[in-house]
Design a protein with these regions (language model features):
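Conserved, mostly hydrophobic/aromatic
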Residues: 13, 92, 123, 165, ...
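N-terminal basic/disordered segments at the start of proteins
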Residues: 1-20
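Glycine-rich, proline-tolerant flexible connector loops at the mouths of alpha/beta enzymes
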Residues: 22-41, 61-68, 250-256
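Active-site-adjacent beta->alpha loops and helix N-cap segments on the catalytic face
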Residues: 35-43, 93-99, 136-149, 253-255
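Catalytic alpha/beta core domains of metabolic enzymes, predominantly
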Residues: 107, 111-242, 256-259
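Conserved small/polar residues in nucleotide/adenosyl-binding loops
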Residues: 293-300
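Hydrophobic faces of well-ordered beta-strands that scaffold small-molecule active sites
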Residues: 1-3, 21-23, 57-61, 88-90, ...
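Active-site beta->alpha loop and helix N-cap motifs at the rims of alpha/beta catalytic domains
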Residues: 39-100, 105-115
Length: 300
């Protein structure tokens, strides 16, 4: 699943081989500060472009919602259904229950920080897809997927719950959906899509008593690594992950095209039994320009 923050990046995602695309509308998504957010009237064209290539179109409506916004949410859900949007990605129960009530497929957002089987069981009454928290290890992901299969946990469609994970992109300093750093510093909430990403900045560590500056190897002390799983993609797919999500709705179309094409090629290689360390290293070289800090794989 590839990101689209503009029509340019939407085209890039589809050119890169994405079989699904996620996007936001206006201020009701986790990229509300973006300058090139789509508008509600763009929905029919977004869906048409995706469906022309056989890709699914997923609307992110994953911020926390206040009472005065519920009518706007309902109107947007109605417009999404009319336009043929394939699913809504959400974390607020007000959005989830309304979308479900009007027959829109629901996918649980990473903002719901789903980390365990109890959460999966609960959300299965509303959602067919669950995006697991970024912070889970590969072993934890595997146990949840095995649990879904063993217990036969099904969503509203009647099919087994599908598990989606973020495969590439930024890692938050906090557990997904639980960071308040931007709100505390700038009164701009990450959970309202308005994160200033102060954790992604360079910092100096100073001893307040002596004034001495501490020597550190990485000045990005609160965000030392980005998420990059291409070198362990065979293990991830072998664990039973159904959807690989690529972060980047605020990135350039070139970024989207490169990352999408690399992961598409790598996933195909896994399915065809052609994945190898040598090919993984080659994919990593192509991704180097798409890593802001340092890369890390999965902690097993």
């Amino acid at each position: 699943m590839a990101p689209a923050g503009s029509f340019e990046s939407l085209a890039a995602a589809l050119q890169g081989g994405a079989d699904s695309v996620y996007f936001g509308i206006g201020k009701l998504n986790m990229r509300s500060r973006a300058t090139a957010n789509f508008a509600e009237e763009d929905l029919p064209e977004i869906v048409a472009r995706c469906h022309e290539t056989g890709a699914k179109a997923y609307l992110t409506l994953n911020i926390i919602v206040y009472d005065e916004e519920l009518e706007t949410v309902r109107n947007l859900c109605a417009a999404a259904k009319a336009a043929g949007v394939d699913a809504v990605i959400a974390s607020d129960l007000a959005v989830i229950t309304h979308a479900h009530s009007i027959g829109l497929e629901v996918h649980m957002s990473v903002q719901a920080n789903v980390c365990n089987m109890a959460s999966v069981r609960f959300y299965a009454q509303y959602a067919d897809v669950v995006v697991l928290a970024r912070e889970l290890t590969l072993g934890q992901i595997r146990r949840i997927i095995d649990g879904i299969r063993d217990e036969g946990i099904r969503g509203p469609s009647g099919d087994l719950i599908r598990v989606e994970i973020f495969a590439h992109g930024a890692l938050c300093v906090a557990v997904s959906g639980k960071c308040h750093m931007s709100l505390a510093a700038y009164n701009s909430s990450a959970n309202r899509g308005a994160c200033f990403q102060n954790c992604r900045r360079a910092y100096r560590v100073t001893d307040e008593e002596t004034g001495n500056e501490l020597v550190i190897d990485n000045k990005y002390v609160m965000s030392p690594r980005d998420l990059c799983t291409v070198q362990v993609l065979d293990q991830i797919l072998d664990a039973g992950v159904s959807v690989l999500k690529l972060e980047g709705r605020g990135r350039s179309s070139d970024y989207v095209r490169t990352v999408t094409s690399v992961y598409r090629e790598a996933a195909r290689a896994c399915l065809e039994g052609a994945f190898s360390p040598a090919r993984a290293n080659a994919w990593m070289e192509r991704l180097e320009s798409c890593l802001l800090y340092t890369s890390d794989a999965a902690d097993e």
